[in-house]
Swiss-Prot record:
This is tRNA-specific 2-thiouridylase MnmA 2. The active site is at C104 (nucleophile), C200 (cysteine persulfide intermediate). The record marks H129, Q341 as: Interaction with tRNA. Disulfide bonds join C104-C200. Keywords: ATP-binding, Cytoplasm, Disulfide bond, Nucleotide-binding, RNA-binding, Transferase, tRNA processing, tRNA-binding. It comes from Geobacillus kaustophilus (strain HTA426). NCBIfam families: PRK00143.1 (NF001138), trmU (TIGR00420). It holds the Pfam family tRNA_Me_trans_C.
Length: 371
């Protein structure tokens, strides 16, 4: 039997942004016993000695006082360093392009934070993610957020039944404009705060400069797959598949793009033209595949997939593998599919799960230059 809202404790992960602020407000208005928790995941002091986390926490304090809910901060810096940041660096070292948001959701927000919330008597946790949870046919389904421009299920692809049974997404049914309007009408301190962009621990800083503090740059040669040298690079980890800007290749004609990298030889491979065949692949192998239902499909099946966050769904056939991975065959050749990024599967509105892109193929042949 479900408890009444006033007997149900919901711990809200609050970032100091408008989305989590409105999530907390809506739960409070619905009568839940709400506690706000600020997760301190990164020791971040900028060049001026200002810690952005301190500013964000001050916004959490203001909002919680306005709403009338208790709040406090919890430090997850060690877990974040061990589980998210170390993974991030290791992937870059290996020449891949990782997605730290996926790992942060898996290891911090829906693991360390969830466990902490349960230890203080929470019935549920809630976040400001644009996603929805529904219980039907005897299981929890994760559905896309109602605002197609803000849907965040791509980053939540590693969640399963244990997490979804304990999670609320109070703004998942709303458009972003509605969230802003609700915050404004309630006079919340964060109503006009701009959305954070980029990777949380880098913030507004220059990515190359940030990474160089942890991974010393190793400049090297930039060449075509035929071996023609086109210039020098600053370090292969600074570039991603499909990248166009910052290559410094002169001359006329179509622009040049990164098509691959060889970490061992420290070579960056480039090709000319947006439609260059070297940018395209027809299938991939994914590892660490998670199924939201907790049930691995027995047979190949058709669905749609995304290979990056801001990409329209494409038709694919998924072949589950015995090792827990999956082979994903595309209906049409796909451009700049990048090892290290997430491949996420959908059936209409439902997010089925996802994994990490490990290898990329064209017509059955592994693209050796992609990594």
């Amino acid at each position: 039997m479900n408890k009444a809202p006033h007997e149900t404790r919901v711990v809200v992960g609050m970032s100091g942004g408008v989305d989590s602020s409105v999530a907390a407000l809506l739960l409070k208005e619905q009568g839940y016993d709400v506690i706000g928790i600020f997760m301190k995941n990164w020791d971040d002091t900028d060049e001026n000695g200002v810690c952005t986390a301190t500013e964000d926490y001050e916004d959490v304090v203001r909002v919680c006082n306005q709403i009338g809910i208790p709040y406090y901060a919890v430090n997850f810096e060690k877990q974040y360093w061990d589980k998210v940041f170390t993974y991030f660096l290791n992937e870059y070292k290996a020449g891949r392009t990782p997605n730290p948001d996926v790992m942060c959701n898996k290891e911090i927000k829906f693991k360390a934070f969830l466990e902490h919330a349960m230890s203080i008597g929470a019935d549920y946790i809630a976040t400001g993610h644009y996603a929805r949870v529904e219980f039907r046919d005897g299981e929890y389904k994760m559905l896309r957020g109602a605002d197609p421009n803000k849907d965040q299920t791509y980053f939540l692809n590693q969640l399963g039944q244990a997490q979804l049974s304990k999670v609320m997404f109070p703004i998942g049914h709303l458009q972003k404009a509605d969230v802003r309007r609700i915050a404004k009408e309630a006079g919340l301190a964060t109503a006009g705060k701009k959305d954070s962009t980029g990777i949380c621990f880098i913030g507004e800083r220059d990515f190359k400069e940030f990474l160089s503090h942890y991974l010393p740059a190793q400049p090297g040669v930039m060449k075509t797959l035929d071996g023609e040298v086109k210039g020098r690079h600053d370090g292969v980890m600074y570039y991603t598949i499909g990248q166009r800007h910052g290559l410094g290749i002169g001359g006329s004609g179509e622009p040049w793009f990164v098509v691959g990298k060889d970490v061992r030889e420290n070579v960056l491979y480039v090709a000319q033209g947006f439609e260059n065949e070297y940018l395209y692949s027809t299938s991939l192998k994914a590892v660490d595949v998670n199924w939201v239902s907790d049930r691995k499909p027995e047979a190949p099946f058709r669905c749609t997939a995304k290979f990056r966050y801001r990409q329209p769904d494409v038709g694919v056939t998924v072949h589950p593998l015995a090792d827990g991975g999956a082979e994903v065959v595309f209906d049409a050749p796909a451009r700049a599919v990048t090892p290290g990024q997430a491949v996420v599967f959908y059936n209409g509105e439902e997010c089925l799960g996802g994994g990490t892109i490990d290898e990329v193929f064209r017509n059955g042949e592994k693209l050796w230059y992609v990594g």
